[in-house]
Amino acid sequence: MNKEGKHQLVAEVHDKLQRAKAVFLADFRGMNVGQATDLRNELRKADVEYKVIKNTLLELASKGTDKEALNPYFAGPTAVAISYDDPVAAAKVLSRFAKEQTNPFTLKAGVLSGKAISPADIQALADLPSREVLIAKMLGSMQAPATNFVGVLAAVPGSFVRALNAIRIKKEGN
């Protein structure tokens, strides 16, 4: 790749890093083409971009972004997974892939909200429920008091009607 191509690639990756919510680095040594293709497809389904880029170009591209915390991890073969939407989904796919593979595919580090996170932190992130599940749980807990209140309001007239019905039955019996 010529110098102009490298400048263009650095600018493109810089823009992607600025837009990303999370970035994860992995050592892909020992992966064959089929495994890499499978990983790319799984990540694509989770709206995550997966690329292999030279460390020096990644380091240049990360300058001026909150992803500079990854600079110490740019050593050896490095693949980068860029998540623009849901960091948990990306962490789930990468962690599952690392567990399932017999080759030494390992997570190096990641960055979330401008802070570097370790492979253990990535695993903890992967263990979280998905965004949709968390939102559903939050909405359920917010909705519970209102549902209980409506139940109480509905019980008062119902109790009144049952009391009137009992009085009517008692009077009809006399």
From Swiss-Prot:
Single Gene Ontology MF annotation: large ribosomal subunit rRNA binding
Pfam family, one: Ribosomal_L10
Record has rRNA-binding as a keyword: yes
Keyword terms, alphabetized: Ribonucleoprotein, Ribosomal protein, RNA-binding, rRNA-binding
InterPro entries from the UniProt entry: Ribosomal_uL10, Ribosomal_uL10-like_sf, Ribosomal_uL10_bac, Ribosomal_uL10_bac_type, Ribosomal_uL10_CS_bac
Protein's GO biological process: translation
Disulphide bonds in the chain: none
Residue stretches spanning the membrane: none
SUPFAM superfamilies from the UniProt entry: Ribosomal protein L10-like (SSF160369)
Domain of life: Bacteria
GO CC annotations, alphabetized: large ribosomal subunit
NCBIfam families xref list: PRK00099.1-1 (NF000955)
Function: Forms part of the ribosomal stalk, playing a central role in the interaction of the ribosome with GTP-bound translation factors.
Family as reported in the entry's similarity comment: Belongs to the universal ribosomal protein uL10 family.
Self-association state and partner proteins as the record states: Part of the ribosomal stalk of the 50S ribosomal subunit. The N-terminus interacts with L11 and the large rRNA to form the base of the stalk. The C-terminus forms an elongated spine to which L12 dimers bind in a sequential fashion forming a multimeric L10(L12)X complex.
Protein name in UniProt: Large ribosomal subunit protein uL10
